[in-house]
Each structure stands twice: as structure tokens, then as C-alpha cells.
Amino acid sequence: MAGRISCCLNLPPLDSNSAQSLASLLKTTSKISCRRTENETEPRKNKCSFVLGVAATVVIGGIQINDVASVEAAVVKSPVEEMAAGVVPPRRWSDKRTCPPWLENSLETIVPENLPRPSAHRRLELAGLAKGDAPPVGVVMTRVNRGGCFSV
């Protein structure tokens, strides 16, 4: 939907030869123009339609705000109501702890809740330094290893 609002003020013309003082300009009040346009098929563009547009916007905005508040009240329940209704929250991995609780000044790494931890079966001894030197830059060297390993 496209719309256009135009407003004209009936201000007195100002020219450099005018002898009107600033006080006389301040005493005159400007009025909003209510003239119709040349094309009578266009909707009325005057202060009445502007006021109606503003009033409609306020009413629709009030309805929307009321609607959002009522939907929020109906959908969002407090945790106390959920506990009273018998809804059990899902179990967290920290509730299934196998080690003793964290002690102050221990060097345990604190991982945020519900983030995956590295596997406990991983062994760092399997990774080691290569026995040979690195190949020089620009040379690609591949070896065939028949021991069930692969090369990258």
C-alpha cells in the first residue's frame, strides 16, 4: 500500500524589500492548508485525513501492544508454574558428574554448560615428532607405507 502525505503552511511571503519586523511575523499564526488538488479523483489531502491517519496508527499500535502482551502472558510460564505443573527440565551433563565437585584453587579447566568435552579415550602419546627432517620448500615428497597407514 502506497500513500503520500503533503502539508502546506500559509506563511506570509518573505522578500528582501519587506519592512515587516520579526515581532509582526511572530504575532501572525500559520494555518494548515485544506485546499483540494486539481484532480478530484485523488483522495483528500488535508489536515482531516492526516489526523485520521495518526489516530488509526495509534489505535492499531495499541491493539498490537495489547495483543503481544496477552500472547506473552499465555505462552510464557514462570519456572514456579512449570514445577507445579510437573514439567521436569532436561538433565544436564553436569548433573551426571562422576568425579568429585570442583575444589577452589584446583587447576581444573572450567567448560561452559552443555558444550562437548574432548573424548576421555584420546591418548596424547600417539602423537609424536617425526623421525626425519621436513622436506625442503617447493619439493613434494611421498612415501609408500605398507603398514596400513596413509600419507597426506
Swiss-Prot record:
The lineage of its organism: Eukaryota, Viridiplantae, Streptophyta, Embryophyta, Tracheophyta. Residues 92-152 are annotated as: Important for chloroplast destabilization and the formation of CV-containing vesicles. The chain crosses the membrane at residues 48-65. It comes from Arabidopsis thaliana (Mouse-ear cress). One of its GO terms (cellular component) is chloroplast envelope. InterPro entries: CV_Inducer. Keywords: Chloroplast, Membrane, Plastid, Stress response, Thylakoid, Transit peptide, Transmembrane, Transmembrane helix, Vacuole. Mostly expressed in senescent and mature leaves but not in young leaves. The keyword Cytoplasm does not apply. Disruption phenotype: Delayed chloroplast turnover and senescence induced by abiotic stress and associated with an enhanced tolerance to drought, salinity, and oxidative stress. It is found in: Plastid, Chloroplast membrane; Plastid, Chloroplast thylakoid membrane; Plastid, Chloroplast envelope; Vacuole. Residues 1-22 form a transit peptide. Triggers stress-induced chloroplast degradation, independently of autophagy and senescence-associated vacuoles. After targeting to the chloroplast, triggers its destabilization and subsequent disassembly, inducing the formation of CV-containing vesicles (CCVs) carrying stromal proteins, envelope membrane proteins, and thylakoid membrane proteins which are released from the chloroplasts and mobilized to the vacuole for proteolysis. This is Protein CHLOROPLAST VESICULATION. The keyword Ubl conjugation does not apply. Its main location: plastid. Interacts with the photosystem II subunit PsbO1 via its C-terminal region in the chloroplast thylakoid membrane and in CV-containing vesicles (CCVs). It is a single-pass membrane protein. GO terms for biological process: chloroplast disassembly; leaf senescence; response to cytokinin; response to oxidative stress; response to salt; response to water deprivation. Induction: Induced by abiotic stresses such as salt stress and methyl viologen (MV)-induced oxidative stress. Triggered by NAC072/RD26 during senescence. Down-regulated by cytokinin.
